[in-house]
Regions:
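C-terminal hydrophobic helical "lid"/dimerization subdomain
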Residues: 2-4, 297-350
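Glycine-rich beta-strand-centered segment in the early N-terminal region that forms part
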Residues: 24-38, 51-101, 106, 145-148
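NAD(P)H dinucleotide-binding glycine-rich loop of Rossmann-like/cofactor-binding domains
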Residues: 94-181
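Adenosine-nucleotide cofactor-binding segment
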Residues: 174-183, 193-253
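N-terminal Rossmann-fold NAD(P) dinucleotide-binding loop
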Residues: 187-188
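Helix-to-beta-strand junctions that scaffold the AdoMet/dcAdoMet cofactor pocket
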Residues: 258-259
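Glycine-centered, small-residue-biased loops immediately flanking beta-strands
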Residues: 262-263
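Rossmann-fold NAD(P)-binding glycine/threonine-rich loop
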Residues: 269-285, 297-303
Length: 350
């Protein structure tokens, strides 16, 4: 075991604070990574405050990890000390089920999440990236390009793959009209990725003041979704919609925008269920309502390579670890464009 430091929540009502804990020793197939940057995902906040009712304290959040390899186990073939490396939402899975065989580890019933998940190696809970180091099986470690700003790459490990995977699954590309609902951490990545894939991108937002920024990010059109007059011309015009909004809202407003055989995919996990959608709205145009969860390791690497090729990163605000509690409060107010990233060097000076 190796002693490390991090930031943890010890209850739903306490702020995160300095935490000393241990990582497992480096095994034959493991990679030890010095964490340079860790993105701040809204899932971190949900878990810390036990809004999904599954937190096991203490919680060390963080699943958007970019770092540098410190050491590798004897059987590791794809990495060496000094390499850049990334870790996303998963650190293990069963490796034998149909989902794992199809490189869809995120759907494995026995997958292990990067934090707040039972660790098969230690018997304890996993601890995430708000830390100076992490040890992960090589299969779940990703290659990071040195062509991109590392801090801005970190959110790709969650926000990037969470939006890339459904866009790829539903074959978004040239000639398609694609709607993106919401312009937050997920939405701004969805706009960039859909545009890079060649689609005509329509951004739907409740905030008129986001129009200029949405077009800067790559949206061809911006529609204020609470304005009925703006929404009417878009009825039955979209091939695919990626809905990134987690807050419960009326889904029928958006399914009505789909063409026959169109699909709307939900990305955001709501604290409360959405109102039930109109079945008729789906049946009479053979529309589909679907969901998608992050992405498998192979696809995550594909996404990282795609982003390096197209010079795509997240828009980030870099913060010291000491400001994480204030960052959570700002997230709740929507006061971030578009993702906080922790500079983990500040943990050493904390």
């Amino acid at each position: 075991m190796r002693k490390v430091i991090g930031y943890a929540a010890h209850s739903a009502s306490e702020p995160l604070k300095h935490f000393n804990f241990e990582r497992r020793s480096v095994g034959a197939k493991d990679i030890q990574i010095e964490i340079l940057f860790c993105g701040v995902c809204h899932s971190d906040l949900h878990t810390v405050r036990n809004e999904w009712h599954n937190a096991k304290y203490p919680v060390v959040p963080g699943h958007e990890i970019v770092g540098r390899v410190l050491s590798v186990g004897a059987d590791v073939k794809g990495f060496k000390a000094g390499d850049l490396a990334g870790v996303g939402c998963l650190v293990d899975s069963c490796r034998v089920c149909e989902e794992c065989a199809d490189d869809l580890e995120q759907y494995c019933d026995n997958s292990t999440y990067t934090y707040n998940s039972p660790d098969k190696h230690t018997g304890k809970m996993t601890y995430g990236g708000y830390s100076n180091e992490i040890v992960v099986d090589e299969h779940f470690v990703l290659h990071i390009s040195d062509k991109l700003e590392l801090a801005a790459v970190a959110p790709l490990l969650c926000a990037g793959i969470t939006t890339y995977s459904p866009l790829r699954h539903w074959k978004v590309g040239p000639g398609m009209r694609v709607g993106i609902v919401g312009l937050g951490g997920l939405g701004h990545m969805a706009v960039k990725l859909a545009r890079a894939m060649g689609a005509h991108v329509v951004l739907f937002t409740t905030s008129p003041d986001k129009a200029i920024d949405a077009k800067r990010l790559g949206a061809h059109e911006v529609v204020v979704s609470k304005n009925d007059n703006e929404m009417k011309p878009y009825a039955k015009t979209l091939d695919f919609i990626l809905n990134t909004v987690a807050a419960d809202h009326n889904l029928d407003v958006f399914t009505a925008l789909l063409k026959r055989d169109g699909t709307m995919c939900l990305n955001g996990v709501p604290e409360k269920p959405h109102p039930s959608p109109s079945v008729g709205n789906l049946i009479f145009k053979r529309r589909q309502l679907a969901g998608s969860l992050i992405g498998g390791i192979k696809e995550t690497q594909e996404m990282l390579d795609f982003c390096a090729e197209h010079n795509i990163t997240s828009d980030v605000e870099i913060i010291p670890i000491m400001e994480i509690n204030e960052a959570y409060e700002r997230m709740l107010k929507g006061d971030v464009k578009y993702r906080f990233v922790i500079d983990m060097a500040t943990l050493k000076s904390e």
